[in-house]
């Protein structure tokens, strides 16, 4: 029993006896995000055909469209006035028409000896978002890599009580160009030598920053297509280097399954039973655990990509060995258990939060239970907690400039 008291669910699992969302402070669940304060369209937002037409409208030959795209996606440049290979007369016109400023850097913090960098951005309209760049040096088992955790919404409408972003509510969706621009900015940061040891460009992208990516499906999907398109029309990344996270918008998972883009799907599960998950993840009241895991299994079957099951361990809430056994059974009963990999996340603290990380012995027991069931499991190497840049901590302190709290 926890210090706050507990009860037992109909399935025999321990449940907190007090509400997990503090009374009077519940944040409403918002699945359909209002598109307020939308940014102007950017070159990145245009289709290949629209880019060709855009340069023609300025009296410039069609081949210039690919030239412009090469600057953007291969050299990560976004100021046409500096591009001497474009006709001088057209540079400012193109800049004014298709290159509005989308991200303005407000602040930048680093930790882990400079290998973790969190950037606070101001968007069009004043909303604030954050992205985190993490460099991992080579080890005996893996090559060096730079991973970018990017945002897809300003705020989040999923209202998860343990997540700083979710407790701030939702302001608006981000555009495709705003999403991709975070990657270009990270590449410029690496190229400038501002991340010790890193070279080249971002190797992996995780849609695990601010927002629920599946609630901004159209912009996120177009961003993924742009990031994975061959140069000069896109950034030229492998879809397998991208991870798309969701708390469980089942219809969008089913839609993604049919897209034919083999990104890694990460399911933020955090509880294997509906009784607890209804409290931790409010969207579970709409799409239950079985529906979610069925959709995830079908995604793995269709794409041949292993699904990542994200599970933040919270002291006396969801960290019991009995729950690990339930999670293992949920995975095993859907066939070959190697379709999923459990990624355990030590809960990261947020200012004023009553949520805390599991005791080491409880975390170890959880891992051992999964291993006894032969479930692939790892404990995440948490980065950036000193600068509030770790999982669940991104809140863009101050929320916005000119939009209120």
Curated annotation (Swiss-Prot):
Pfam families: Radical_SAM (PF04055)
Record localization: Cytoplasm
GO molecular function: 4 iron, 4 sulfur cluster binding; metal ion binding; rRNA (adenine(2503)-C2-)-methyltransferase activity; rRNA binding; tRNA (adenine(37)-C2)-methyltransferase activity; tRNA binding
UniProt-listed InterPro entries: Aldolase_TIM, Methyltransferase_A, RNA_MTrfase_RlmN, rRNA_lsu_MTrfase_RlmN/Cfr, rSAM
Biased composition range(s): Low complexity: 1-15
Catalytic activity: adenosine(2503) in 23S rRNA + 2 reduced [2Fe-2S]-[ferredoxin] + 2 S-adenosyl-L-methionine = 2-methyladenosine(2503) in 23S rRNA + 5'-deoxyadenosine + L-methionine + 2 oxidized [2Fe-2S]-[ferredoxin] + S-adenosyl-L-homocysteine; adenosine(37) in tRNA + 2 reduced [2Fe-2S]-[ferredoxin] + 2 S-adenosyl-L-methionine = 2-methyladenosine(37) in tRNA + 5'-deoxyadenosine + L-methionine + 2 oxidized [2Fe-2S]-[ferredoxin] + S-adenosyl-L-homocysteine
Annotated region described as Disordered, given as residue ranges: 1-34
Miscellaneous: Reaction proceeds by a ping-pong mechanism involving intermediate methylation of a conserved cysteine residue.
Protein name: Probable dual-specificity RNA methyltransferase RlmN
Organism in which the protein naturally occurs: Cutibacterium acnes (strain DSM 16379 / KPA171202)
């Amino acid at each position: 029993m926890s210090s706050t008291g507990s009860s037992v669910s109909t399935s025999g699992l321990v449940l907190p006896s007090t509400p997990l969302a503090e009374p009077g402070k519940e944040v409403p669940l918002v699945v359909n995000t209002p598109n307020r304060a939308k940014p102007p369209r950017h070159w990145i937002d245009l289709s290949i055909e629209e880019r060709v037409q855009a340069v023609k409208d300025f009296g410039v030959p069609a081949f210039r469209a690919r030239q412009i795209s090469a600057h953007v996606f291969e050299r990560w440049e976004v100021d046409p006035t500096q591009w001497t290979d474009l006709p001088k007369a057209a540079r400012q016109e193109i800049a004014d028409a298709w290159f509005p400023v989308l991200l303005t850097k407000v602040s930048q913090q680093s930790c882990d000896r400079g290998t973790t960098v969190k950037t606070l951005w101001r968007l069009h309209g004043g909303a604030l978002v954050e992205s985190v760049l993490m460099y991992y040096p080579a080890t005996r088992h893996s090559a060096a890599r730079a991973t970018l955790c990017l945002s897809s919404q300003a705020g989040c409408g999923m209202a998860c009580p343990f997540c700083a972003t979710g407790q701030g509510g939702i302001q608006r969706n981000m555009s495709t160009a705003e999403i991709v621009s975070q990657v270009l900015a990270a590449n410029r940061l690496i190229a400038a030598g501002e991340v010790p040891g890193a070279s080249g460009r971002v190797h992996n992208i995780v849609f695990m920053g601010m927002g629920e990516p599946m609630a901004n499906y159209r912009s996120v999907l177009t961003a993924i297509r742009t990031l994975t398109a061959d140069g000069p029309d896109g950034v030229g990344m492998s879809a397998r280097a991208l991870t798309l996270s969701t708390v469980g918008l089942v219809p969008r998972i089913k839609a993604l399954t049919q897209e034919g883009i083999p990104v890694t799907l990460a399911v933020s599960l955090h509880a294997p039973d509906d009784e607890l998950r209804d409290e931790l993840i409010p969207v579970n009241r709409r799409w239950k655990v079985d529906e979610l895991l069925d959709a995830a299994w079908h995604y793995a079957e269709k794409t041949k990509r292993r699904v990542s099951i994200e599970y933040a361990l919270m002291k006396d809430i969801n960290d019991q060995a009995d729950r690990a056994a339930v999670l293992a059974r949920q995975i095993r009963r859907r066939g070959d258990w190697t379709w999923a990999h459990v990624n355990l996340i030590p809960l990261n603290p947020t200012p004023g939060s009553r949520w805390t990380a599991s005791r080491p012995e409880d975390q170890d027991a959880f891992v051992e239970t999964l291993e006894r069931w032969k479930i692939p499991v790892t404990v995440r190497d948490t980065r950036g907690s000193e600068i509030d840049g770790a999982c669940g901590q991104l809140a863009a302190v101050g929320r916005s400039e000119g939009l209120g709290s």
